[in-house]
Amino acid sequence: MKMFYSGKFIGDVRNTQNIKLAELAQGLCSTAQLARIESGVRSAEKLLFDSLYERLGKNTERFTAYLDCDEYERLLARIRICCCIDEGRYSDAREQIAAYRKATKNNIHMQYLCLAECELMQKTGSSVSACKDKLMEGIRCTYPEFDIDNIAGYYLSRLEMLHVQQYVNCIEQSGQKDRAAKLYGDILDYT
């Protein structure tokens, strides 16, 4: 019952904002799946719901989510990855990332992994160029033709925006201060 209302709410907001089904679903799920979510026929896992809702410009922190066992296990795996990176256990983090990658091919999860790998790369001294490539790989999980110079043309979730912000940070670190300043402005203007 709860998913019916949350899916219907996504549909109502999408329709109010005149966003096409395909535009909102781009890279996250099929348009048929989104239509089933909006009609209440199908529920969405938390990461998918959050991404759809955030692409509509809404905050997901007001929702309480009940996770099934699989979602809960994936959440714990993401927490373990973050803890390993934060605690400097980089080889453990790599193992956790590899195990997570084997367990899923979902674009949102792959995007998360690219962001985690980039953080790991930064902490272990990888080049700025390699980090940029990893971040672009992540954003292109959902937007294959993504153009960093035109972020206003996309509906971005919080995870996607984190990729963009980190990418611009890498541009700044590579010495392209003027380009980074322009892109930071684009991020601030993003609505």
Locate each region found by the language model:
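DNA major-groove recognition helix of helix-turn-helix/homeodomain DNA-binding modules
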Residues: L47-R62
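Flexible helix-coil transition and linker loops at the boundaries of alpha-helical arrays
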Residues: A65-Y66, A99-M110, R140-R158, D189-T191
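Residues that mark the junctions of alpha-helical repeat units in TPR/alpha-solenoid scaffolds
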Residues: E73, I108-M110, A130-C131, G153-L156, ...
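Short, charged recognition helix plus adjacent turn
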Residues: A65-D92
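Helix-turn-helix repeat elements of alpha-solenoid scaffolds
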Residues: C82-A99, T124-F146, S174-Y190
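A short, Lys/Arg-rich alpha-helix, primarily the initiator
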Residues: M1-T16
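Short alpha-helical DNA-recognition segment
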Residues: T16-R36
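"A position-specific structural signal for the A-helix of alpha-solenoid helical repeats
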Residues: F9, L75, I79, H109-L120, ...
